[in-house]
């Protein structure tokens, strides 16, 4: 009798497990796929340089998508006030981003840069970026650009938010530019080209709006510095900044 009951119990258990296994394929995902978006102006600032120039600067990023797949737009540039020159667009990029790990995404797409004027010769390029959080919560973006002439440029941007209180942060920032090839057309010399170090104190009024003040130092290096010296131009720049970090 016990053997019959045991055999029946085993048969029933196997039947239930088999039915559950077959039905799992029809179960909906416990978390549905949802799509979100964000627009972030990481730097929206007014700069006063050591040679008395007033410069407006923006650095923004917008994205839309899910956890793994996103459409990303990045734009960065500056305008020197009252110098008679057009706005300098440092980049405008449209990218596809894919999350490759918990903290890193790879992005690739196309971009353009140059002076925003009707007769400007814009530089168009393909770009691959690796962006995310490094150990100890350093925010990093590594980008490789290849323009239509085959000229290559590598750019690294690193930031760290040192939290002083619930609403106050001290943010060191480093940007390094390296030209992997010469470019006569765009007046670039190969080698390590420029390094820029900044420090900003940021205070959140609300989470979405955080005014800041800061300082920076920029230095041309290598062949780029030699070319500037030959033209009688300065190879370094220091400035103070006043701006806000805004997102929505």
What residue ranges belong to the model's regions?
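Outer-membrane beta-barrel initiation region
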Residues: 19-82, 98
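Hydrophobic, lipid-facing positions within transmembrane beta-strands of outer-membrane proteins
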Residues: 37, 56-60, 90-94, 124-128, ...
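Transmembrane beta-barrel strands of outer-membrane/channel proteins
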Residues: 43, 73-77, 108-112, 142-146, ...
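Solvent-exposed loop/turn segments connecting transmembrane beta-strands
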Residues: 47-55, 78-90, 112-124, 144-155, ...
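Residue-level signature of outer-membrane beta-barrel architecture
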Residues: 64-66, 98, 132, 146, ...
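Repeated loop/turn-to-beta-strand initiation elements of outer-membrane beta-barrel proteins
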Residues: 67-73, 102-108, 136-140, 165-170, ...
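Detector for outer-membrane/organellar transmembrane beta-barrel domains
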Residues: 119-183
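Outer-membrane beta-barrel "beta-signal"
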Residues: 201-204, 234-248
């Amino acid at each position: 009798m016990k053997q019959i009951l045991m055999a029946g119990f085993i048969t029933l258990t196997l039947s239930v497990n088999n039915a559950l296994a077959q039905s799992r394929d029809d179960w909906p995902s416990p978390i549905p796929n949802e799509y979100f978006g964000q627009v972030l102006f990481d730097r929206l600032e007014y700069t006063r340089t050591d040679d008395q120039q007033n410069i407006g600067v923006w650095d923004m990023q917008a994205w839309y998508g899910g956890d793994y797949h996103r459409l990303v737009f990045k734009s960065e540039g500056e305008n020197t006030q009252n110098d008679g020159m057009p706005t300098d667009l440092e980049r405008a990029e449209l990218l596809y981003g894919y999350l490759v790990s918990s903290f890193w995404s790879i992005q690739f797409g196309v971009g353009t840069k140059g002076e925003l004027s009707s007769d400007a010769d814009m530089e168009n390029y393909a770009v691959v970026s690796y962006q995310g959080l490094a150990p100890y919560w350093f925010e990093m973006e590594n980008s490789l650009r290849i323009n239509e002439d085959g000229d290559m440029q590598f750019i690294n941007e690193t930031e760290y938010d040192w939290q002083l209180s619930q609403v106050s942060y001290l943010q060191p920032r480093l940007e390094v530019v390296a030209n992997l090839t010469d470019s006569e057309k765009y007046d670039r010399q190969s080698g390590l080209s420029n390094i820029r170090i900044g420090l900003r104190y940021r205070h959140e009024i609300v989470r979405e709006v955080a005014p800041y003040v800061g300082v920076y130092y920029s230095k041309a290096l290598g062949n780029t510095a030699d070319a500037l010296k030959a033209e009688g131009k300065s190879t370094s720049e220091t400035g103070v900044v006043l701006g806000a970090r805004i997102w929505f």
